[in-house]
């Protein structure tokens, strides 16, 4: 009787399923909650990504505008630099010309001063010579009058001299003597005329020098005005250069902001970790049965990915996660072509979202397939138990032994077929599976490990009994 009672207990324990139906339903419920959370998070990320795209496009347009403006300012600056060089050369030429004109003006003034002194000295000499000429003329007239008086006196005193004076030979002698007296003052008059012509030439030369001096002074004032204008233009160019430097600084800041924004959509694994960080901990936050979740975690030991040191995940919003990524290594990025980079980032971000959506649908399909398999397997086990219990109801010991063997064989066959099916589905999904999708595979591996541990504990308990 004791043996029969032990066989009945053994057969009852062996007829139990290889898995706990409640644990399986809880795992499927967690998978469904995970899919729902993934879909909601996908929508949130899509909205934030679209907003980021719009902000990125605006910044790209602003940077392009500032780049064009900077190129224009650089071109203007180059033209201004060329103008500066030309103005410097012109200023140097004008300074040299001004210096030369100053030297010429000084030389002309010295020459004018010397010529003025020469003119004054010549005028004094001319006046002296004129006085001497007047004096000589007066002396000559006195001498002629004196000779005439003496001649008259001698004619009246000596009658014979009258004949001599009236003779043709004497007339010719008197004519020659008078002509010699008349030719005497001629060289002085010629010298006076020559000096007067020289004075006139010197006066004309002085007037020409004065005209040249006035022209040089006018040129000097024009050069000074042009130099002041060049200084004013130089001040304006300096202000333009400072403005160009300010615009370059603003452009550099915008480029740094652009690098930070483009780094958010980089192809590194940090982006996948940051995007999946809130999703991996969503079941923990939304678990409706915290007591059972803790028990399950205690059974798994290291069943959660957050418990491993290589997958440390913090629950945070997308902005803080992305800011953490940017703060991690902002200097390792460099800005390339902004427009092409923005387009590639947009395509890559949309591909990530599409892959997440596809993986979610694949997860739903896998969940439905597993659920249908489990239901079919449970229905088949119950149906087989009913069919085998009817013809062998007469011998209870045989029924218990046969039922235990068939139940264990069916459990093993169902587990083997389920694992094969899961492996086939995993292989099919791994063909286009990115790195961050390993999370889903790890979740199902944890579920299978939990089931295997439960079965092992059941086998151990049965064997111990």
Curated annotation (Swiss-Prot):
Segments for region (Disordered): 282-314, 382-417
InterPro entries linked to this entry: CDR2
Signal peptide region: none
GO MF term set: identical protein binding
Modified residues (Phosphoserine): 308, 318, 344
GO CC annotations, alphabetized: cytoplasm
Domain of life: Eukaryota
Keyword list, A-Z: Coiled coil, Phosphoprotein
Gene Ontology process terms (BP): Golgi to secretory granule transport; vesicle transport along microtubule
Biased composition (Basic and acidic residues): 392-405
UniProt feature coiled coil, ranges: 38-143, 188-265, 350-377
PANTHER family linked: CENTROCORTIN FAMILY MEMBER, CEREBELLAR DEGENERATION-RELATED PROTEIN 2-LIKE
Family according to the record: Belongs to the CDR2 family.
Protein name per UniProt: Cerebellar degeneration-related protein 2-like
Native species: Homo sapiens
Gene symbol of the encoding locus: CDR2L
